[in-house]
Amino acid sequence: MIKIAVCDDEPFMRAEMASRISGYMEEKKIPCQLHCFGGGGEILGSDMAFDILFLDIQMEGMDGMEAARLMRARGYGGMLIFITVLKEEVFEAFEVRAFDYLVKPLEDSRFKRTMGRALAALVQEPG
């Protein structure tokens, strides 16, 4: 089962992302566990055992880029997909080995393309 997390400090955006992800996974008939977090501190307090993490950059307190750096330093090897309004942070995302970078408001076709690529990459990973 694929484990997916969404970390965004805006409740509406968390709910929208959860709905998009659930809908996509149901459409593809792929079982998943979906977890939602309201900030970087929350996700760092979890077991971080997610295959895919959708992470907002601009959040109150700890921003998503800082959370991503700390997660990578603690051994998180899953896919990071940033979701943000900040187009200018795209180059910094490479420093934490981001899988993709989605700009809000999300385009449905771009989201689906990213999900398809992420799931294909997971299937190809050994183990």
Enumerate the predicted regions with their spans:
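Non-catalytic signal-transmission and effector/linker regions of two-component phosphorelay proteins
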Residues: 1-3
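Two-component/phosphorelay signaling modules centered on CheY-like receiver
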Residues: 11-35, 73
